[in-house]
UniProtKB/Swiss-Prot annotation:
Similarity section: Belongs to the pyruvate kinase family.
Protein name listed in UniProt: Pyruvate kinase
Cofactor(s) needed: Mg(2+); K(+)
InterPro entries: Pyr_Knase, Pyrv/PenolPyrv_kinase-like_dom, Pyrv_kinase-like_dom_sf, Pyrv_Knase-like_insert_dom_sf, Pyrv_Knase_brl, Pyrv_Knase_C, Pyrv_Knase_C_sf, Pyrv_Knase_insert_dom_sf
Residues the entry annotates as binding substrate: 33, 244-245, 277
Organism taxonomic ancestry: Bacteria, Pseudomonadati, Chlamydiota, Chlamydiia, Chlamydiales
UniProt key word Protein biosynthesis: no
Organism, scientific name: Chlamydia pneumoniae
Stored Pfam families: PK, PK_C
Binding residue positions for ATP: 35-38, 74, 155
Transmembrane segment boundaries: none
PANTHER family, alphabetized: PYRUVATE KINASE
Its EC number(s): 2.7.1.40
A GO molecular function held by the record: magnesium ion binding
Domain of life where this protein originates: Bacteria
Amino acid sequence: MITRTKIICTIGPATNSPEMLAKLLDAGMNVARLNFSHGSHETHGQAIGFLKELREQKRVPLAIMLDTKGPEIRLGNIPQPISVSQGQKLRLVSSDIDGSAEGGVSLYPKGIFPFVPEGADVLIDDGYIHAVVVSSEADSLELEFMNSGLLKSHKSLSIRGVDVALPFMTEKDIADLKFGVEQNMDVVAASFVRYGEDIETMRKCLADLGNPKMPIIAKIENRLGVENFSKIAKLADGIMIARGDLGIELSVVEVPNLQKMMAKVSRETGHFCVTATQMLESMIRNVLPTRAEVSDIANAIYDGSSAVMLSGETASGAHPVAAVKIMRSVILETEKNLSHDSFLKLDDSNSALQVSPYLSAIGLAGIQIAERADAKALIVYTESGSSPMFLSKYRPKFPIIAVTPSTSVYYRLALEWGVYPMLTQESDRAVWRHQACIYGIEQGILSNYDRILVLSRGACMEETNNLTLTIVNDILTGSEFPET
């Protein structure tokens, strides 16, 4: 069975090989995420080559995501991990050094030091290590640790309650986006989005680089991103609820309600929503997840997430393939119990999708007709992707087979809940409907005598305005006589 909620896997040392990537794909991966906070263009280019070859061989819409480093704060190089204990002090410096307990550790970006006051709470490595700033100077900070831990190279660092006025896009981000455009990557996840203008800045950069239509996912991981969420959600193409940094920048107890709010608003705007961070964290080491992790995945789906994401579990974990299989199993079981009717009551006034009145009216009516007729799939032809994206937000009980002539739309739709993209070069209605039925049978979505609903353009129309309820076999044999 195919999941409707999509699975994003982060690729790293544990999985950057043709053999492991093939196993992840077979286990249920829909999107491969490359984290540009780590690795070089050479290693990422190698992974992109493996992934493109794999998706061509398997003929599947596997999307490749570029996750930017963004204006994040990280430790510098630490050749040997530094063991710290409660009460111990350590200096963070602006100079480029190999970190040690005695000489201190580099902190990047170098311009951050003037923004950090004495007494500020510092959280390192997703909050596992807590320290307080006891001394702040123009080019260094002195920390006192509140607990024990192990400092390692390039780990993230957050300063709670401090708005560090760093530019949204760094020189590295621009170089990485240029690389992503040259490599024809499918989607970009923008880290540390704080304002709606950040999305506009990145979109202009992508246009200057030659790909103005590259979809942008806004990662919400700080208080400013939450405060400006409504505008960000309308301007971005999707939202990622980055719970790791969000739970550090804010309080962890705020995260569940924020997750529900962001998932709901994302659906109302018509954009996909990714829930991320620590979904199967224990499987980095263990072969089985905790019960709490299983419940977390299920609740993210009940909230309306379009996709759920694995990070360290597949990038560096001991059981990457098992983690994807577990996630797929949880998704399939949860989707059996999803309350589809509740999604039909969405407020359309916040929609950011550019859809015509025809599609708005006919799309929702089509879903209701198909459900009453017990149709097994909805087939729609799309050049821009907007029709299946619009339909997806209502979480219909049946799959949406999206037929498209656009390669970029084909891969972009891999992120949409319940959408199964099919690439075609045919614009003739009879031909692409026939192809879609064959595809549905091959994917296990359809059988010969299933009812299906087809959305298409009328002969004299430029917009989707036609509904046809019919039988798969009638399309395949050319003996179609529409039921409605």
